[in-house]
């Protein structure tokens, strides 16, 4: 919601008051208490589009998040029953985000780990970009169906390309010009942040194009490396945040950044064009075809997760990764 409030184009006031019928949202609705719960129940009884924000904790019967005496899992199942479309908005709703990081003490999971019988559109990011949220809703309302999705359920129009492929600092990567420390000359000149931990080569997101706060800025533009927050289990796979990724895809093989950048001497212009085109094409194709496509990372995603019950009451299961 915070990100949506600061989106550009159509204002959130126009969206909420004139374009959409937002029957239940704790942050913008006037009702509270029993009146709010009645609004939710009335909406759940008929067809609707469900937008979910936040992870769902399953351990210990779901006691770590309760609303109106019901666990978050119960509320989700009831709300999803008559939903014609479901959007999981934000990294928490998509895969659990930081709450789901090992050892995941609350058993936090994303929406699509609970709702298996309906399509879930995953609008990932921490936070997600407001324009991607509103564009996804606009597409659904206009076409009556979900936009084309990648293998992880994310809209391809937004998540079809890596940050690395459209980053304004990409020419410095190709030229082998890297920030080595945050106070060096390269940092002042706006060089590539790969050496100080940027996860842009492994992260699919439109951040460089849309940015945040009416295009006022974004992390890399402010001099901070991308942490990969749109990618599943990023906190387990991409930490330490300020450590360089082991490898990045280049010229069809895994090559270090130094080999890609410094090895282009004499053929820079042609090589850069080929590298950018090939990696962009491979990125879109790989993400479209394969869930959890192999990308440079420090570790694997957690292997164990809590199991939601068929009755809406979470089972108690150790969610710590093996």
Model-derived regions, located:
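Iron-sulfur-associated redox domains of electron-transfer enzymes in respiratory
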Residues: 1-206, 217-219, 239, 263-287
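Short Cys/His-rich local motifs and their 1-3 flanking residues in nucleic-acid-associated proteins
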Residues: 231
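Cytoplasmic C-terminal tails of single-pass
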Residues: 285-322
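Short, non-ligating residues that shape and space the ligands of small metal-coordination modules
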Residues: 235-236
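Short, membrane-exposed interhelical loops at transmembrane-helix boundaries
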Residues: 208-216, 242-253
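Juxtamembrane/start-of-transmembrane alpha-helix segments at the extracytoplasmic/lumenal side
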Residues: 251-265
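Cys/His/Pro-rich metal-binding microdomains
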Residues: 227
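Mid-to-C-terminal functional-domain signal that highlights helix-capping/loop sites
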Residues: 75-77, 112-116, 249-255, 299-302, ...
């Amino acid at each position: 919601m915070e990100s949506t409030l600061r989106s550009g184009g159509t204002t959130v006031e126009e969206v909420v008051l004139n374009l959409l019928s937002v029957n239940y949202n704790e942050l913008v609705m006037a009702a509270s208490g029993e009146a709010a719960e009645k609004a939710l129940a009335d909406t759940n009884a008929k067809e609707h589009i469900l937008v979910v924000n936040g992870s769902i904790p399953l351990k210990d019967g779901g006691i770590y998040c309760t609303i109106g005496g019901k666990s978050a899992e119960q509320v989700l199942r009831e709300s999803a029953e008559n939903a014609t479309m479901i959007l999981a908005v934000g990294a928490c709703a998509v895969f659990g985000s930081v709450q789901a990081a090992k050892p995941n003490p609350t058993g936090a999971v994303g929406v699509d780990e609970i709702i298996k019988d309906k399509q879930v559109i995953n609008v990932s990011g921490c936070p997600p970009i407001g324009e991607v949220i509103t564009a996804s809703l606009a597409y659904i309302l206009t076409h009556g169906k979900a936009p084309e999705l990648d293998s992880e359920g994310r809209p391809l129009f937004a998540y079809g390309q890596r940050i690395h492929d459209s980053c304004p600092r990409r020419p410095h990567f190709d030229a082998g010009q890297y920030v080595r420390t945050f106070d060096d000359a390269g940092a002042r000149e706006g060089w590539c942040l790969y050496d100080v931990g940027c996860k842009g080569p492994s992260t699919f997101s439109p951040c460089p194009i849309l940015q945040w706060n009416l295009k006022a800025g974004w992390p890399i533009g402010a001099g901070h490396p991308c942490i990969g927050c749109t990618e599943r289990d990023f906190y387990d796979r991409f930490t330490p945040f300020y450590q360089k990724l082991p490898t990045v895809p280049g010229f069809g093989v895994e090559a270090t950044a130094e080999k890609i950048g410094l090895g282009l001497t004499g053929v820079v212009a042609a090589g850069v064009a080929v590298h950018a085109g090939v990696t962009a094409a491979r990125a879109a194709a790989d993400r479209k075809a394969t869930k959890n496509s192999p990308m440079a990372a420090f570790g694997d995603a957690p292997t164990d997760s809590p199991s939601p019950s068929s009755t809406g009451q979470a089972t108690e299961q150790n969610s710590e990764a093996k």
